[in-house]
Amino acid sequence: MRIHPTAIVEDGAQLHDSVTVGPYSIIESGAVIGEGCRIESNVRIFGVTRMGAHNRVCHGATLGSEPQDLSFTPEKARPLIIGDHNHFKECVNISGGIKSEGGTRIGSHNYWMAFSHAGHDCVVGDHNVFANTATLAGHVEIDDHCFLSGQVAVHQFCRIGSYVMIAGVTGVPQDVPPYMLADGHRARLIGLNVVGLRRNGFGQEQRTRIKQVYRLILRSGLRLDDALQRAEDEYPGPETKRIVAFIRASRRGIVSFG
């Protein structure tokens, strides 16, 4: 273990022997940091944080900080659970939980660019990219393989489905279903995330099926329940199943199309 002499590692913090801690960083009692993690300079890791292996935390980042919620009191604190192989760039802030027993949960292989933020009780999957200053309000859920561009702001309790791309400076007030592109001052669906799907190995047949499913759901004029059922019947497959399940589970509704 390599700990810079100016760093503060409180008694009760649990660090794997292979962890490195840079100058002026603070790791509070109760924090758990797994194998191969690299903590750079001026980082603060709060005691509610539980971190897996091979994460990199860059200058000025804060992980597990107090939720930005006026109702917060220390006895309400819930954990921040982080998986493996995440990269937190400069001044990233991830809050601990407050209102859900599981707390704030970050999966694995996520890339958080400078000044990006996840609020309390967010649940983030794997292989996502959050560009500079992308912001998730409390209780937001992000699935897998999403790309949120710079200055995207997601309203609390919204859900973002897998393989979604959201354009820069977009405000997201409702759920964004899987495989889609969203853009606008208030997000609107503008088409399929074709580039993202190609990069993740989706073939032409899969992309065509996804497009057919969304054309049916968004443009057929059918009642939503009827359109979802018809999509399942006419275009069976894992992509259809993911889309239909996501929309049926929506509490805030889906962002508009076009």
UniProtKB/Swiss-Prot annotation:
Name listed for the protein in its UniProt record: Acyl-[acyl-carrier-protein]--UDP-N-acetylglucosamine O-acyltransferase
Assembly mode: Homotrimer.
Protein family (similarity comment): Belongs to the transferase hexapeptide repeat family. LpxA subfamily.
Summary of the function given for this chain in its UniProt record: Involved in the biosynthesis of lipid A, a phosphorylated glycolipid that anchors the lipopolysaccharide to the outer membrane of the cell.
Enzyme class: transferase
Pfam families xrefs: Acetyltransf_11, Hexapep
Keyword entries, A-Z: Acyltransferase, Cytoplasm, Lipid A biosynthesis, Lipid biosynthesis, Lipid metabolism, Repeat, Transferase
Reactions catalysed: a (3R)-hydroxyacyl-[ACP] + UDP-N-acetyl-alpha-D-glucosamine = a UDP-3-O-[(3R)-3-hydroxyacyl]-N-acetyl-alpha-D-glucosamine + holo-[ACP]
Compartment(s) of residence: Cytoplasm
Main location, first listed in the record: cytoplasm
Biological process, per Gene Ontology: lipid A biosynthetic process
Gene Ontology molecular-function annotations: acyl-[acyl-carrier-protein]-UDP-N-acetylglucosamine O-acyltransferase activity
Signal sequence bounds: none
Enzyme nomenclature, EC number: 2.3.1.129
Cellular component terms per the entry's GO annotation: cytoplasm; membrane
This protein's pathway: Glycolipid biosynthesis; lipid IV(A) biosynthesis; lipid IV(A) from (3R)-3-hydroxytetradecanoyl-[acyl-carrier-protein] and UDP-N-acetyl-alpha-D-glucosamine: step 1/6
Xref: PANTHER family: ACYL-[ACYL-CARRIER-PROTEIN]--UDP-N-ACETYLGLUCOSAMINE O-ACYLTRANSFERASE, ACYL-[ACYL-CARRIER-PROTEIN]--UDP-N-ACETYLGLUCOSAMINE O-ACYLTRANSFERASE, MITOCHONDRIAL-RELATED
Gene that this polypeptide is encoded by: lpxA
